[in-house]
Curated annotation (Swiss-Prot):
Full protein name: DNA topoisomerase 4 subunit A
Function in brief: Topoisomerase IV is essential for chromosome segregation. It relaxes supercoiled DNA. Performs the decatenation events required during the replication of a circular DNA molecule.
PROSITE patterns: TOPO_IIA
GO biological process, one term: DNA topological change
Top-level taxonomy: Bacteria, Bacillati, Bacillota, Bacilli, Bacillales
Oligomer status and interactors: Heterotetramer composed of ParC and ParE.
Site keyed Interaction with DNA: positions: 39, 75, 77, 88, 94
CDD domains for the chain: TOP4c (cd00187)
């Protein structure tokens, strides 16, 4: 035997072989045929059971026998894959109408594996036999099996639209399919209407076929998605569980789930909901129980007293498989190729298949009727000359000679002569003659009817309609899935997602933020906070985990951080830098932080910059749903910095102090509310080379503490300040010196909450009590606190 060696590139060989493989798995494995809705392995299983007599009216047989028949005759693949496909056809949570009845453990909605095939027993369901009905009447084409030892059908007659009724799911090379199951009665009714009017629109079809009907029930939302899928083959719907509310004896409520979305694993759903409870992702759930038994599916979610059950339900819809998106992708094999098909195309392909099936069956029955008619006519003729026929047969040598004599003497045909010589003596009675004549009339009528069906297309369609109506009447069932027109927007109260807990919020001047339990805070004390060298506490306060923190930076931006998203860190430990929560620029500095409980308020923020700009914006403007990046709070011009952010419940006085010792006080009522992207208006009329060092709210019981670069502290009372108008130059608070004049590097309004100050020089920190600093007159430079010759100039001051 000579070898043929081909010189081919690896690229060409791989491309060719993968192309063949792809075509094979598309056509022979993963995608259903539009005509019978079956993949090849499913078709082979059903045909093997039918041809071996494993039908609904017989006893159950071991599944292993069927698997062996399928592998041995039609499907030379692994036994597990065949058994898996067989089991799926018996699972009433996967198929709207099961095609195989199975005794024994056939898996569960919890995705438990079925018992081994040697333990389970199966037989065809009654409805499955409608897929195979008339297969022995030459209704469909047969091809040789894999080893040419027998024949198998290319497609089943499929006397109902199985593709739509039971749906299909599968993945192949370059293609996937997701066709949902539907209600059998609705699908048949839509098919009947399509037969009556082939130009019927999708909208008109949807009067009869409302949408998918999942075996697990559930609630389907989104008629627009259904319509889009029925028109184009692709669409999206929402499927949510059926949830009811019950009240227990102790007054608590519980959510009862009796239906879940299609192909959702029940045990995984229960586990997920319980994880949300255990991880405190949702507050208000006491216990989650799977109470499913033989009476049906039931999941109980017991709630705490006085919780918002609707919000908990909505949270679970959004964060578990209690609600899912189902995406239609109606791809099926049509004319040997995968096609994305709308519902009209699917029904049309099915109808064309039925026309062919009924026509082939009618031809088969007509041929048999005509053959029988021919025999009956021969028998009637023979009985009319019975004595002569008997005499001729008795004088013949054998059966063959008798047949030849009948053909030659009385002009019977070969078939008629065969029937005559095979006729038994007891049939030669008057009763039998009458019966033959009656049969002859019936055959005449049948042949006439069959020819009419073949010659008249409308008559053929009427046959299809009658048989579909019979199946509808016999197998119809109520719809399981409820359809709602609109997709409901899920609204979740924050109280449901986050357990309410009072905690301590802290922010350092270097940007380290954390939340700490009250217990940890009380066990340590304020002074024991974890800090890096050179850092200090900017603010700390008691907040709730359901609150929101707004962190403002010198760039005029703010970070929106829900308190519950902050790391829970002990008071003595270092916090988390804000840049790890929301990315900020390297030179961006935190200047203030505020806590918001409710953005629906009349409160407002005031923003002041170093170059003397000021702006007022209401709190509700700062509410957002974006947590992942900094947001604009105010526009800060080039070469300027935001130095102060204040929050007020109502209009009040603010004081501005500049580096050269100027001060201006006016009411925030002079500021108009502006948007977040506005830069604001002029706050104070600055001298040349002067800049703002402080803008803070002030009241008549407050004092102001100022620090100069020369190490001096000056404290003045509110009465020195003069209330004026915005954008004026203000009053002078320092005595001007010709040589080495004092310049204010920091200033703060001192309220009853403040008792200490900290002065920072280049190489030293100086701490002291604010009350030790006596109040000064307007035109003084205060008292020297730091020796700048030893420690350098003062650069900053904080109060606490």
């Amino acid at each position: 035997m000579s070898e043929i060696i081909q010189d081919l590139s690896l690229e060409d060989v791989l491309g060719d072989r993968f192309g063949r493989y792809s075509k094979y798995i598309i056509q022979e494995r993963a995608l259903p045929d539009v005509r019978d809705g079956l993949k090849p392995v499913q078709r082979r299983i059903l045909y093997a059971m039918y041809s071996s007599g494993n039908t609904h009216d017989k006893n159950f047989r071991k599944s292993a026998k069927t698997v062996g028949d399928v592998i041995g005759q039609y499907h030379p693949h692994g036994d597990f894959s065949v058994y898996e496909a067989m089991v799926r056809l018996s699972q009433d949570w996967k198929l709207r109408h099961v095609l195989i009845e199975m005794h024994g453990n056939n898996g569960s909605i919890d995705n438990d594996p079925p018992a081994a095939m040697r333990y389970t027993e199966a037989k065809l369901s009654l409805l499955a036999e409608e897929l195979l009905r008339d297969i022995n009447k030459e209704t469909v084409s047969f091809i040789s099996n894999y080893d040419d030892t027998t024949l198998e059908p290319m497609v089943l007659p499929s006397r109902f639209p199985n593709l739509l009724v039971n749906g299909s799911t599968g993945i192949s090379a370059g293609y996937a399919t997701d066709i949902p199951p539907h209600n059998l009665a609705e699908v048949i009714q839509a098919t009947l209407k399509y037969i009556d009017n082939p130009d019927i629109t999708v909208n008109q079809l949807m009067k009869y076929i409302k949408g998918p009907d999942f075996p697990t029930g559930g609630i389907i939302q989104g008629i627009d998605g259904i319509k889009k899928a029925y028109e184009s083959g692709k669409g999206r719907i929402i499927v949510r569980s059926k949830v009811e509310e019950e009240t227990l004896r102790n007054g608590r409520k519980q959510l009862i789930i009796t239906e879940i979305p299609y192909e959702v694993n029940k045990s995984s759903l229960v586990k997920r909901i319980d994880e949300l409870r255990a991880d405190k992702k949702v507050d208000g759930i006491v216990e989650v129980r799977d109470e499913t038994d033989r009476t049906g599916l039931r999941i109980a979610i017991e709630l705490k007293k006085d919780v918002n059950s609707e919000s908990i339900k909505n949270y679970l819809y959004k964060n578990s498989d209690l609600q899912i998106s189902y995406n239609f992708n109606m791809v099926a094999i049509s004319d040997g190729r995968p096609k994305l098909m709308g519902i009209r195309q699917i029904i049309d392909s099915y109808l064309n298949h039925q026309i062919e099936v009924v026509a082939n069956r009618t031809k088969f029955e007509l041929d048999n009727a005509e053959k029988r008619m021919h025999i009956v006519e021969g028998l009637i003729k023979a009985l009319s000359i019975l004595d002569k026929v008997i005499e001729l047969i008795r004088s013949s040598k054998n059966k063959r000679d008798a047949k030849e004599n009948l053909i030659e003497v009385y002009e019977f045909t070969e078939e008629q002569a065969e029937a005559i010589v095979m006729l038994q003596l007891y049939r030669l009675t008057n009763t039998d003659i009458v019966a033959l004549e009656g049969e002859h009339k019936e055959l005449e009528a049948l042949i006439k009817q069959l020819r009419h069906i073949l010659d008249n297309h409308d008559a053929l369609l009427n046959v299809i309609k009658e048989e579909l109506n019979e199946i509808k009447k016999k197998f119809k069932s109520e719809r399981l899935s409820l359809i709602e027109a609109e997709i409901e927007e899920i609204k979740i109260d924050k109280e449901v997602m986050v357990p309410s807990e009072e905690v301590i919020l802290s922010m350092t001047r270097h940007g380290y933020i954390k939340r700490t339990s009250i217990r940890s805070y009380n066990a340590s004390g304020v002074e024991d906070i974890g800090l890096k060298d050179g850092d200090s506490l900017l603010k700390h306060q008691e907040v709730n985990t359901q609150d929101t923190v707004l962190v403002f930076t010198n760039k005029g931006r703010y970070l929106f951080i829900p308190v519950h998203k902050l790391a829970d860190i002990r008071w003595k430990e270092l916090g988390q830098h804000v840049s790890q929560i929301v990315p900020i620029e390297e030179d961006e500095v935190v200047i203030n932080v505020f806590n918001e409980k409710d953005f629906n308020t009349d409160a407002f923020y005031v923003f002041a910059t170093q170059n003397g700009m000021i702006k007022k914006s209401t709190v509700p403007l700062f509410k957002t749903t974006r947590f992942n990046k900094p947001l604009i709070a105010t526009k800060v011009k080039e070469n300027d910095d935001l130095i102060s952010v204040m929050r007020f419940e109502k209009d009040q006085l603010i004081t501005i102090i500049t580096n050269k010792g100027m001060s201006l006080t006016y009411n925030t009522s002079e500021l108009s509310d502006t948007g977040l992207r506005a830069a604001g208006v002029k706050s104070i009329n600055l001298k040349a080379e002067d800049f703002v060092v402080m803008t803070e709210g002030v009241s008549e019981n407050d004092t102001i503490l100022m620090a100069t670069q020369r190490g001096s502290l000056k404290r003045i009372s509110f009465k020195i300040l003069q209330v004026a108008k915005r954008a004026q130059r203000g009053i002078t608070l320092l005595k001007e010196l010709k040589k080495n004049p004092h310049r204010i590097v920091a200033a703060h309004v001192v309220t009853g909450e403040h008792s200490q100050y900290t002065l920072y020089s280049k190489s030293n920190e100086e701490h002291g009590l604010i009350n030790d600093i006596h109040k000064s007159e307007q035109y003084t430079n205060g008292s020297f606190i730091v020796d700048t010759d030893d420690f350098g100039e003062v650069i900053d001051m904080y109060i606490s």
